[in-house]
Design a protein with these regions (language model features):
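Cofactor-centric catalytic regions
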Residues: 1-95, 108-221
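Phosphate-handling active-site elements
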Residues: 96-100
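Short conserved active-site loop signatures built around small residues
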Residues: 103
């Protein structure tokens, strides 16, 4: 463990239970005489690996609402075949309540990308993923704030649905006020009429290095 760190949670027991089920551990352990001079036995190996270097690694993410209602996400983590572009887009889509196709992920350009320590140390899904979550939460607040201006109401009267922002309590028809505004309209009006692009940048670092766990079983003869 780094810096005397104590693991606050562990699912190693679930890994072991699953691998025992997959290999038929209870029927085969510790060994089985095949009756032909051969014996079969089973064994289990377990491992853990920290996620990022605690108190050292940092990840940053920028997400922007475009004038067409789609999102642009700029990251500093390089996709070296690990699929992190897809993984981080999935995280953002979950947070923003939208489809993955609504998010365009831009590859790394160290001249302009937000800073990231790098795609190493099993850190991207955990560290950069949490930076995505923080960025999405900040961006949603900005979207709601801008929608409140357009709908002439308080921010606490609105909710973000993913495709639009709407009033929690609808106003009567004929009142002269709208009950809902689409994300496309928000992005378009913010960028084209207010000279303002809705975007957010957040960073994430971790005081701990939470480890994923694994268990594997083998049968030998």
């Amino acid at each position: 463990a780094y810096y005397g760190e104590t693991a606050e949670s562990c699912t190693l027991d679930r890994c072991v239970d699953r691998v025992k089920e997959m290999i038929g551990w209870d029927e085969k352990y510790p060994r089985k005489d095949m009756g032909n001079g051969k014996v079969r036995g089973v064994g289990i190996a377990m491992a853990m690996q920290g996620s990022s270097i605690s108190k050292v690694d940092v990840a940053s993410v920028t997400i922007k609402v475009n004038d067409d209602g789609f999102y642009s996400m700029t990251i500093g983590a390089s996709d070296m075949g690990t699929g992190c572009d897809t993984t981080l887009a999935q995280v953002a889509a979950e947070c923003l309540n939208c489809e993955m196709d609504d998010i365009v992920v831009y590859g790394v350009d160290t001249d302009i990308s937000p800073y990231d320590s790098g795609s190493y140390a099993s850190s991207t899904a955990y560290l950069t993923g949490n930076a995505v979550v923080k960025t999405c939460e900040t961006l949603k607040k900005k979207i709601i704030k801008k929608a409140a201006e357009y709908l002439s109401c308080g921010e606490d009267e609105l909710e973000f649905t993913g495709k639009s922002v709407k009033r929690l309590t609808p106003v009567p028809e004929g009142s002269g006020f709208e009950n809902e505004i689409s994300l496309l309209d928000i992005g378009n009006r913010a960028m084209c009429f207010n000279n303002e692009a809705l975007q957010a940048t957040e960073s994430c670092t971790s005081p701990v290095s939470p480890p994923p766990f694994m268990a594997g079983a083998a049968e030998v003869e």
